[in-house]
Amino acid sequence: MYNIEKFIKVGAHFGHTTSKWNPNMRKYIFMKKGGIHIIDISKTIKKINEACKFIKNIVSSGKKILFVATKKQAKDIVSDYAKKVNMPYITERWLGGILTNMSTIRQSVKKMNVIDRQKIDGTYNMMSKKEKLLIDRLKNKLKKNIGSISKMNSLPACVIIVDVKKEKIAVKECINLCIPIIGIVDTNCDPRNIDYPIPANDDSSKSIHLIISYLTNSILTN
């Protein structure tokens, strides 16, 4: 199932420059080369396998997994795969309190529903051009920020995060709520608070694509 050559081909083994490393990633680093840390792909594969087994257990119980990736090179990849497996995702800015204060999110969802009803019952058509413009802007803003989590009625059973350093607010909320995290961790990340850390290049779109494909495949084949 896992082919080391595939990981090498997409550059999953390339970490950051040695000056940017996090010492807690030491056990996942194979060597230094040209001033860059090289990740031990055998450990990457081992961690992906562990994460996939965990995912299968979650999906078999009918629970939801939230995907999080707001960095440019990961957004489209993650949203496409999340849609494929019918799971919620966040690829725009993480709004503080998305998990720890879901009541705020529900208020935003209510606003979206009100706008939808106004368009159905004809109220929207009776508005002035300026009012319509303001309503449309609000709807687009809410849709962009909330996206697919508008249908998430309860906390996810797990959160998959691309770049745990960038998504530190999401990580903190998951920790506070004891929600397990599966995270792609590069050599500049701290893996200690990640339940299922996957050591790999989190800057390469090809590396991200390969890893997310394995994780989502474990949902499809469950």
Curated annotation (Swiss-Prot):
One of its GO terms (biological process) is translation. Gene3D superfamilies: Glucose-6-phosphate isomerase like protein, domain 1 (3.40.50.10490), Helix hairpin bin (1.10.287.610). Keywords: Ribonucleoprotein, Ribosomal protein. One of its GO terms (molecular function) is structural constituent of ribosome. CDD domains: RPS2. One of its GO terms (cellular component) is cytosolic small ribosomal subunit. The keyword Ribonucleoprotein applies. It holds the Pfam family Ribosomal_S2. Belongs to the universal ribosomal protein uS2 family. PANTHER family: 30S RIBOSOMAL PROTEIN S2 PROKARYOTIC AND ORGANELLAR (PTHR12534), SMALL RIBOSOMAL SUBUNIT PROTEIN US2M (PTHR12534:SF0). This is Small ribosomal subunit protein uS2. The gene is rpsB.
